[in-house]
UniProtKB/Swiss-Prot annotation:
GO BP term, example: response to fructose
DNA-binding region: 3-22
Free-text function comment from the UniProt entry: Regulates the expression of the fruBKA (fru) operon, which encodes proteins involved in the import and metabolism of fructose. In the absence of fructose 1-phosphate (F1P), binds to the promoter region of fruB, interferes with the binding of the RNA polymerase (RNAP) to the promoter and represses the expression of the operon. In the presence of F1P, activates the transcription of the fru operon by facilitating the binding of RNAP to the promoter. Essential for the expression of the fru operon and thus for growth on fructose.
Gene (name only): fruR
Protein name (record): Fructose operon regulatory protein
Provenance organism: Vibrio cholerae serotype O1 (strain ATCC 39315 / El Tor Inaba N16961)
Keywords carried by this UniProt record: Activator, DNA-binding, Repressor, Transcription, Transcription regulation
Origin organism lineage: Bacteria, Pseudomonadati, Pseudomonadota, Gammaproteobacteria, Vibrionales
Entry keyword annotation includes Cytoplasm: no
NCBIfam families noted in UniProt: fruct_sucro_rep, PRK11303.1
The HTH lacI-type domain, residue ranges: 1-58
Summary of the knockout phenotype: Does not affect growth on glucose. Mutant shows a severe growth defect on fructose. In the absence of the gene, expression of the fru genes increases in glucose medium.
Stimuli inducing this protein: Expressed at the highest levels in fructose media. Expression can be modulated by CRP in the presence of fructose and glucose.
InterPro entries: Fruct_sucro_rep (IPR012781), HTH_LacI (IPR000843), Lambda_DNA-bd_dom_sf (IPR010982), Peripla_BP/Lac1_sug-bd_dom (IPR001761), Peripla_BP_I (IPR028082)
């Protein structure tokens, strides 16, 4: 059943039928008699207007896309939930895809989302040449909002948490007088976010002139964190303090410590990210929680502006809050 058929059966114009069905009868002073005629046909044939088709004709779909690296990562899961809630409250749906930090999967997801005529795309990219790829996509008509991992701010809107300065402060928080060596457990060193965190780490350690050990996994996940840390332990190369560049990597470190609890007395830990469970561990772990609400609010504001043809380039830095556990 189409709108044309509804109008013919009700004996009114297509425009009049549309006004009645979409709740605009009072605005256009359509009589109650005409309203009843139209709605009687609507109810008889169980007609449902195709809002998606209407939105596409109007040039928008009232939907956003979101690509994140890992749905099991509590930080990204929290951010996805907030963006979905905020988008829904603004009258938008959000379509979510997971890249697993695989460039091919991410590009396929981006193309699939763009094919759905989304009004803007949020992405935490794991593509080494992400700015180049997403610039082509953006020039084809879909605004891109970078979250958590920045793109080239000359061309893109970016909302990220501070990385270089945060890594500096986090590292410095574990450099007590009894620390004589420091390690960094990270992943995907080719990503800009990884470089920023390593540089902040290096700057803090340089001030003390301490030897460092760097270990990088292939992904930001628990297993990779475990591999790096376990290798240090097996080779008798465990530093006095270790900084993890994500909470998921820290989980792998904690797995090793659970198996060898005597090591808890030999190492100080710090991590990007946070979890309430850290408050209950026998080992003290300093952490860097993100302000997810601020990130989600800022990202949505940028997306709404972009969908209204008011795209703004630049980086918005959301400060982190160092949590020192003593």
């Amino acid at each position: 059943m189409t709108l044309d058929e509804i109008a013919k059966l009700a004996g009114v114009s297509k425009t009049t039928a549309s006004y009645v069905i979409n709740g605009k009868a009072q605005k256009y002073r359509i009589s109650e008699k005409t309203q009843h005629k139209v709605m009687a046909v609507v109810e008889q044939y169980n007609f449902r207007p195709d809002h998606a088709a209407s939105a596409l004709r109007a040039g928008n779909s009232r939907s956003f896309g979101l690509i994140i690296p890992d749905l099991e990562n509590t930080s990204y899961a929290r951010l996805a939930k907030l963006l979905e809630q905020n988008s829904r409250q603004a009258g938008y749906q959000i379509l979510i895809a997971c890249s697993d930090d695989d460039p091919q999967i991410e590009m396929a997801a981006a193309e699939a989302l763009v094919s759905r005529r989304i009004d803007a795309l949020f992405v935490a990219s794991g593509i080494p040449s992400a700015s180049e790829y997403y610039l082509k996509l953006q020039q084809s008509g879909t605004p891109v909002i970078a979250i958590d991992r920045a793109l080239d701010d000359e061309y893109f809107s970016c909302v990220i948490s501070e990385d270089f300065g945060a890594a500096f402060e986090l590292t410095r928080s574990v450099l007590t007088q009894d620390v004589h060596s420091v390690g960094l457990v990270g992943a995907l060193p080719e990503l800009n976010v990884s470089r920023e965190r390593e540089q902040g780490f290096a700057m803090a350690v340089k001030q003390r002139g301490l030897p460092t050990t760097l270990g990088y996994g292939e992904h930001f996940n628990r297993e990779e964190g475990r591999k790096v840390f376990a290798k240090w332990v097996a080779n008798d190369q465990l530093p006095d303090a270790v900084v993890a560049t994500s909470y998921t990597l820290l989980e792998g470190i904690l797995d090793v410590l659970l198996e060898q609890p005597e090591l808890m007395q030999k190492v100080r830990l710090a991590t990007f990210g946070d979890n309430r469970l850290l408050d209950f561990l026998p080992i003290r772990v300093n952490s860097l929680p993100q302000q997810f609400e601020l990130i989600a609010d800022s990202a949505l504001a940028l997306a709404l502006n972009a969908s209204a043809k008011r795209y703004q380039t630049g980086i918005e830095l959301i400060p982190r809050q160092l949590k020192v556990r003593t």
